[in-house]
Each structure stands twice: as structure tokens, then as C-alpha cells.
Curated annotation (Swiss-Prot):
InterPro entries (UniProt xref): MliC_sf, OapB
SUPFAM superfamilies: YdhA-like
Organism the protein comes from: Haemophilus influenzae (strain ATCC 51907 / DSM 11121 / KW20 / Rd)
Identification of the protein by name: Opacity-associated protein OapB
Signal peptide: none
Taxonomic path: Bacteria, Pseudomonadati, Pseudomonadota, Gammaproteobacteria, Pasteurellales
Amino acid sequence: MLKKTSLIFTALLMTGCVQNANVTTPQAQKMQVEKVDKALQKGEADRYLCQDDRVVRVVHATHKKYKKNLHYVTVTFQGVSEKLTLMISERGKNYANIRWMWQERDDFSTLKTNLGEILATQCVSQTSERLSGQ
């Protein structure tokens, strides 16, 4: 009886070590970016020229219920648009969401990631255009 048990135990150990485990590597998740329909935007679009010839486009959106206070902007940088919400700031205006932070100042503006990585710095407003939407 002891001989059979040890033989079965050894066989199970051998088969446990021999089996191939299919390990799948996790695929990197892509961030889903909210699509912004630029044709329907109302407000004022500013084009900022930044250091290293980077361009940032900022749309200060106006809606009927937000006419007095601008609560958000849409920032476009390198083909990606993000809707940023106004935050409290001592100097200038800060807009942010979970990914980006736009610091709007009188002299220079800056676009950063929320991890602190600078995407565009020393941005100066070049042109401004009115957007009427549809």
C-alpha cells in the first residue's frame, strides 16, 4: 500500500512539473480620449506658440448657462484634445483634468501632464478667433 501511494505521489509530482503553463502577457491599455467635435464649439479659440515651435490651441467655451463664468476650456496639443475644468489659483487661471494641466498666465502659459512632465512651456498667445458653432 505504501509503495502504491509513493508511486502515485511521484507520478503526480512529475506530471505537475512537466505541464506547460500558458502565460499570457498583459497588453498595454490604451487611454480613451473623449472626442471633441470642433465644428460645434462656441467661444474663442487662442493659438499659443511655445518653446521648440510647439503649438497649443485653447478654446474658451461659452454656453448660455455659463456666459458669465468660463468653467472649462478645450486644449488641443499634437492632435489630442482634452476638456479641462477651471481650478482655483492664486495667480492666473489653472485648468486641469485627470491627464493634463493648463496654466494660463499673462506672460507665459504652460501645459503639463498631471505627473508634472512639461509638454509645452513658455507659450505665448499668437492669434484669437471667434467660434460660432452650429
